[in-house]
């Protein structure tokens, strides 16, 4: 009886392993079928990876709470509010930030709440907090990235943050935040940092993951150079949102870009639309000899080289490069990155 039980258990294990092997083989066949039929979407893979890496921090507070309340809660030690928070809407935003309002309004602006904190017993020493509710994290990242100051230094405060001598700038959830002091001093620098940390720690937000960011290789990409254009990138109105980043290739700095195109015709149709647009502006299409990138288009815009191509539903390219060979090399790097990711995800099967 004991021997029979052992034999039965051994047989059960063998059957289980055999079943797993069959299921694995069926999965490989299914992926291959999707690839052949054009049904595999590399972006769904990246989206899944991003979802796995994103976490929600447990908290009793939320960045969805009243902006005025948030400002009151981030008061640093040794400082006090100089009054009540000011609130600005679409109609009054330009009263506070004259000359810069259009960018915010185009990126989903909801409201701005501002509050000045003054040093106790020394009201001439102060800093002001600008809390922009942009409605969604991608909108907050867009305004953060597009107007990032060239003299800014990347900060470890938050994933997307930087500092200048008298200020700190960062995005957090749906908010884009600026904290600007009246002068440069250690006291104000410490107060601003404390206030920013109070906001981040007391009002945690869901981790921000931008799909387009994962579609561009990190290798040779300059940290903090990314910019998100929600519309009209490079003056082309038909573009969906476009992410750009600066790369160093062959000792040259160049701008790469990526856009996910889900409309009629997808990325392939967008490549043709953009080609026609550039030629309409006076661009000259140049023949590309022996490119490793299928369907690559190169347009000479009076010395500025525009290179672009599509892979799946993504349009990728190099914008306004001065060195043709370096631009072609970077385009090949972009294409290789996407195809390598695809092959890795499908067990070596080609795109």
Where are these predicted regions, by residue range?
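Long, charged/polar, surface-exposed segments that mediate recognition or autoinhibition
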Residues: 134-150, 154-155, 193-204, 260-282, ...
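Short, surface-exposed beta-strand/loop micro-motifs that present aromatic residues
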Residues: 112-119, 164-171, 241-249, 297-298, ...
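Short, well-ordered beta-strand elements
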Residues: 128-129, 174-182, 255-258, 313-321
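C-terminal soluble interaction/assembly domains
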Residues: 260-349
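N-terminal "mature-domain start" segment
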Residues: 9-126, 154, 176, 183-253, ...
């Amino acid at each position: 009886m004991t021997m029979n039980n052992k034999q039965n258990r051994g047989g059960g294990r063998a059957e289980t392993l055999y079943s797993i092997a069959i299921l694995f083989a069926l999965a490989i066949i299914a992926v291959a079928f999707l690839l052949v039929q054009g049904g595999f979407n590399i972006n769904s893979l990246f989206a899944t990876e991003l979802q796995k890496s994103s976490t929600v921090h447990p908290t009793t507070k939320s960045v969805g709470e009243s902006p005025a309340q948030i400002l009151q809660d981030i008061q640093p030690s040794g400082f006090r509010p100089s009054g009540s928070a000011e609130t600005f809407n679409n109609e009054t935003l330009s009263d506070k930030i004259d000359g810069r309002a259009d960018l915010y309004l185009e990126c989903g602006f909801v409201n701005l709440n501002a509050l000045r904190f003054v040093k106790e017993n020394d009201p001439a020493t102060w800093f002001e907090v600008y809390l922009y509710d942009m409605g969604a994290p991608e909108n907050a990242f867009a305004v953060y990235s597009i107007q990032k100051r060239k003299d800014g230094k990347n900060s470890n405060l938050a994933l997307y943050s930087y500092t200048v001598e008298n200020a700190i700038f960062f995005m957090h959830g749906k908010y884009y935040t600026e904290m600007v002091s009246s002068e440069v001093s250690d006291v104000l620098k410490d107060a601003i940092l404390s206030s920013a940390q109070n906001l981040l720690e007391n009002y945690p937000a869901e981790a921000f993951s931008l799909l387009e960011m994962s579609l561009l290789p990190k290798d040779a990409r300059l940290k903090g150079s990314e910019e998100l254009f929600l519309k009209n990138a490079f003056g082309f109105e038909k573009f969906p949102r476009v992410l750009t980043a600066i790369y160093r290739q062959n000792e040259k700095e160049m701008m790469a870009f990526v856009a996910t195109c889900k409309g009629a015709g997808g990325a392939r149709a967008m490549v043709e639309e953009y080609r026609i647009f550039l030629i309409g502006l006076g661009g000259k299409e140049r023949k590309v000899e022996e490119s490793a990138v299928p369907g690559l288009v190169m347009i000479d815009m009076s010395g500025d080289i525009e290179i672009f191509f599509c892979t799946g539903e993504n349009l990728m390219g190099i914008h306004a490069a001065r060195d043709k060979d370096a631009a072609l090399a970077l385009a090949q790097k972009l294409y290789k990155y996407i195809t390598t990711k695809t092959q890795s995800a499908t067990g070596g099967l080609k795109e």
